[in-house]
């Protein structure tokens, strides 16, 4: 498969590719762009960004698409693979002067057919809250740039909240906001709450707000993402480090260093057990949340990796007998149904497996990456990589596919985290099998066995109903969590060991294993799909969405979906 993907050097733009599920096809009529369809001159502009939200309306057209190109921002009804895009009827269109949108995020919790909250970050540091359906601009945060003057790199709603959101800047700082708070016209004053190696958390002294300021690493904070259960926050920075925090307590859970250069992007696996990163080393790196270590790297791109994303619809638990696939809607719909219902089916499949036969269970995670080399790569993370040194057994597979509701035992950061103020010992060198340097996963068996008791995997995704019931309580706890974070006196905080890890000394340690010390993944496919660098990769139920810097948002129909397309 890898040879098919890499193939000969060519400038030909691919319009289809094949995986084990079947044929993926580009749908030209489902392409979204600026209404004039003229390629955007990307010189000096921020990356094109895309956000989705589903309004759960009764018309069947519940998906909404927001994308930013240069100084322009558009919101459309996203018709996906079924109908052609109508660029003449945007829900909302905005053109900004003096600044450019850099990122945006819908609030999925509060979205309805009548109203949706959209956060937009800008190159000058401001953040705007708008409702593209009601056409109302609700609020502008950091309006006078008193909080931070640098470019907004990432903005996201706090999971389960209708009012809290987090904003990262190229300064390396990250700020929490509350849409219900009033922000003054003077610069805020912060006091130190917690400090660790290469990070510090401050509290705003204002009586009207209790917002936090995080300073993480050195250089720009390029992206952050919440774990599927909302308890942990992962950040990647220009200094090349991945850092994972307990969000409420601001405790550092674990870190990882890139092979070279800055880390630009990351994504959690649907069950919260793994994080994939990409960056300036042209690699994708898979990091285990439970073990706090790199478990694999992937080499397929020829330039910086700009986006990584897991595909929850092909991430699966399967019996040893392979599933039959064909280019038909029925078979692929069965696969999607299985993907959506993994939470319920995982236990039933494993129980049935244990009671009927001895066929092993296989765990496969699918993720994708796009880069500045204009290539799309798809990767499979399989059980031989996840659990080296051990024969595949039903008990082992059972232990590792359960307990994704809360993150694994030991996730408080104390049980498995390498102390942040010291460089881990070097890994053993090996010129034979790449697994030789990987620690024996059997030592984690007791942790994994305890994880089983927490219940059936839900891939850490709360239902909309559950989130609405819980978000008020979460907001109350997070608004008062500073007492927990600041439990130590300021004197003790000032005595925290400020020693910094020397990046040059991390190579060959568990923070940054050598290339020969961890398994090297080859892409399933690696296809050139655009003329300009790729900046977007989103996996939806019936398609894959990509976008390039020319401003074209492309829809790739999954196998079996093209036949029902309506112009």
Curated annotation (Swiss-Prot):
The modification Phosphoserine is found at residues 355, 358, 430, 432, 463. The keyword Phosphoprotein applies. It is found in: Cytoplasm; Nucleus. Keywords: Acetylation, Cytoplasm, Nucleus, Phosphoprotein, Repeat, WD repeat. The modification N-acetylalanine is found at residue 2. WD repeats lie at residues 147-187, 216-257, 258-297, 345-389, 529-566. It holds the Pfam family WD40. Residues 411-421, 429-441 have a biased composition (Polar residues). Regulator of deubiquitinating complexes. Activates deubiquitinating activity of complexes containing USP12. Anchors at the base of the ubiquitin-contacting loop of USP12 and remotely modulates the catalytic center of the enzyme. Regulates shuttling of complexes containing USP12 between the plasma membrane, cytoplasm and nucleus. This is WD repeat-containing protein 20.
